[in-house]
Amino acid sequence: MPQQNLLILYGSQTGTAEDLAGRLSREAKRHHFNCRTEALDEYRVANLINEHLVIFVCATTGQGDPPDNMKNFWRFIFRRNLPHNALCQMDYAVLGLGDSSYPKFNFIAKKLHKRLNQLGACPLLPAALGDDQHELGPDAVVDPWLKDLWSKVLSMFPLRPGLEIISEDVLLPPKYSLRLLEEKVGQSELSGDAYERDFISNNTTPPSEIHPFLAPVLSNERVSAHDHFQDVRLIEFNITGSAIQFYPGDVVMVQPRNSLLHVEQFCSLLHLDPLNKVVVEPSDPESPVPMHLAALCSVQQLVERYLDICSIPRRSFFQLFCHFSPDEMEREKLKEFSCAAGQEELYSYCNRPRRTILEVLVDFPHTTRCIPATFLLELIPQIRPRAFSIASSMEALPNTIQILMAVVQYKTKLIEPRRGLCSTWLASLPPHGTERVPIWVKKGSMKFPCDPDTPVVMVGPGTGVAPFRAAIQERVANGRPGNCLFFGCRGKSKDFYFEKEWEDLGNRGYLTLFTAFSRDQEDKIYVQHRIKENSKLLWDLIGTKQGYVYIAGNAKLMPNEVTDALKWVLQLEGGMSAPDAEQYLASMEKSCRFQSETWS
């Protein structure tokens, strides 16, 4: 009897859903299932009609949006012309990850579960709705749900006679194993020249994650006051000859690197020679090694460019890490962090102080020394690319991309300040230096009106103003007035980004600007207050002239408060009832006249 096939599909923005899909995959192997795991947008969705057992793991981002790597799938699965029985052969389960402090908690998982059922698929269980706000995190829901899932699945597909579930004490082989060679790399290989020749874009097709463009840094300017608590940079990349095309609302992806100091510390802890050549090999011949892994040639490149040693380790890290421990005390502690009962302890140790993988390795020296190199790719996740809204227009500034970036740094109970991997690295790069930044462009969610006479209202506090600078530059370059910007920050003299630029455009009749400086007076003033103060203008632009409204910035409170202010304007100036104002904004959203791009 052949093994039962199981497909695990995930949509992940920060890596949590992908990590959970990996956990499911390992559990499937322990239950003797033939398991495939793919990101939703990497899976050929037309094949879904042939699948019989599928588990979906998906996060909800921003204001109820799907993760970037499931957006194409999301559009496809909600096509109106799909037959109502298209998935009648499928048994499925949906595992969602969200944050209950947001209004659209686990919106994607709930909607996907309902849609699959509408298309004839049979749910194995109610959708699981993991919550970041729970004191134990998503695992509070995930752990009992997985027990119920495997109980249900095994009742439908029992183990073959003579087979038993593989114990957690048994170490499964890694998906990709790392082999160290005695041969050393040369200086040109260590600097990455050979690696980059294989890895970079060929300049005839647009760069991508597989083939990024290595962009020189043209400028790196601090645009917040030097005595301001937050270091914000305007960074400009040279994209001459890259074949990159972008439009207002698009995002540039940046692949960051670990610092050489952290690379050296990691290699020292594991007794690795950075100069050793490496080969990455698949455990399964049918799972070829990804190109970016196959191109790696040295330990230093592996650690600097691939292993996310400065990320916060997840539970899965400790579940594997404890297998290598020869020390009884360390092993017991690692097992505690690995089990369901130890999650509160793990949260206090890792999540609350934001302790990194590298710092955990320091804390468990006996175990760290015994990590087999072959398991490094299984133990430590890949460095994820970071997304930045493009803050410039190709029309105004050809051959360049600019980003507005806050350098992440904060204190916890740990002595060493916490620093953002990507922002710290980018902020350290000097203009016209030798270091190149791997970048590529992805289409953004914002779409601006084609009609030059359509007014545009933009609400972008802080670094949320970045995509609107690109839009305003482009519209001005094409002679389009009717640009209205609501910008908010802490202080006029502290973090008023692009002040002179906005002033010049206002004087030329291209921009109407409203500012909210929250800390320049006793009572805090935010962009939503300015919206209410200018209700007549807003109603004229939105209600009379059918303008477009855009919101960008932090997803926590601002988007909802701005939306409430807009509803207030519709009621006051448009004479609408509260339900009518709600419906009006909903219809604007449906016709793309009301758009938002927010991030956590």
Curated annotation (Swiss-Prot):
Its cofactor is FAD; FMN. It is found in: Cytoplasm, Perinuclear region. It catalyses: 2 oxidized [2Fe-2S]-[protein] + NADPH = 2 reduced [2Fe-2S]-[protein] + NADP(+) + H(+). Keywords: Cytoplasm, FAD, Flavoprotein, FMN, NADP, Oxidoreductase. Residues 6-150 form the Flavodoxin-like domain. NADPH-dependent reductase which is a central component of the cytosolic iron-sulfur (Fe-S) protein assembly (CIA) machinery. Transfers electrons from NADPH via its FAD and FMN prosthetic groups to the [2Fe-2S] cluster of ciapin1, another key component of the CIA machinery. In turn, this reduced cluster provides electrons for assembly of cytosolic iron-sulfur cluster proteins. It can also reduce the [2Fe-2S] cluster of cisd1 and activate this protein implicated in Fe/S cluster repair. This is NADPH-dependent diflavin oxidoreductase 1. It comes from Xenopus laevis.
